[in-house]
């Protein structure tokens, strides 16, 4: 894999600006019943359930029976008999919208005789299809290369970014599941808004029976309110930085050392007001904070040479080390005093968790590439890795590999085959491994137990032993 980095050229500074903009919309909405069709279906279902049991008609029952003779679930509200008294909406239209997305980029590059630079800034604003949600990102990038002498070069890369992501409601906030499920399962008979512009709730959509009772509307959570009022915001600040130095030790022999850091800070806040929470008055909020820091140090020596215009040799040996540190804190509170207060200090503590971990890894690496006449390739690699995630008796692993290749398209007999421009046959064998286990999986955890201490009946002590 060849990774290239944008870099300025010697000469005058070049400034480049790019702007892209577009619109997003739902490609295809799911067709839904209108109120008249939905009510007709509901009446048919309730009449059937009232009259039939397991496919058999119940004696003495008829579709014309009044509500007073029906079970609660089979009663027919007065409003169903005249659908014009009900609302007629498509919940997808109430939540989905056509939204813009923009991307701004500005960069400058240039250099002098011994220094080159590239600096850029980027701003992305992408509103979500559902109301109240969207994504913004601000990022910078700086690349600098400098020649200290004709044998020593240094370079610096830095890429900070800050993003704000307001995401949609997750599953479990309604009887129908998440937001997108609710949009295609909630009946069209309920309003999204009251006449004064506020979001409609259960209390704003009374239904009545002709026997003087009213059904309890338990299974309603306004999707428009859920999309607009449910808050789940993630703020992420990330910085990638690398500093490297290359030194030409001798002809065709180069030493390179680099140190890189990846710092990632995340703050996530959730707030669920009573208007969209099934639990009603149980308003709740959560806050999550985390810091993830990764360090990498690489040191390599490379020898590269060509002999007699046909033999190419590349030999690399090196040592690398990595370290990762992670720390997090999560807090949830219930019973916030009202829907305007969103901070966790104002509620009743429901749960809290904290975590702090770290890991290290060290590697010895080696590679030999040999090419003859640009036709025949031989590669051999060897690496030995040690990870702190494993126990002391199995911490290190050795992973060799080898490959041979024949670039057939470079042979003379392929000159007449115009249909093939590049053909290479390659065979390889190697061993690979990973350390994707828990950071402390190799260490036995301390557990709680009971113990009897003393003479006679003794004394029972609870706790860690």
Predicted regions, residues:
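Alpha-helical support elements that line or immediately flank enzyme active sites
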Residues: 241-248, 259-261
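A beta-strand signature from Gram-negative outer-membrane beta-barrel systems
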Residues: 1-16, 101-103, 116, 122-124
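Membrane-embedded beta-strands of outer-membrane beta-barrel proteins
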Residues: 106, 142, 241-243, 299-301, ...
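Solvent-exposed loop/turn segments connecting transmembrane beta-strands
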Residues: 129-131, 388-393
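A generic beta-sheet turn/junction motif
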Residues: 110-114, 123, 372
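Surface-exposed loop/interface segments of Gram-negative outer-membrane beta-barrel transport/assembly proteins
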Residues: 9-88, 128-133, 139, 143-238, ...
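Transmembrane beta-strand segments that form the barrel wall of outer-membrane beta-barrel proteins
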Residues: 19, 121-127, 378-387
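Outer-membrane beta-barrel initiation region
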Residues: 94-98, 108-112
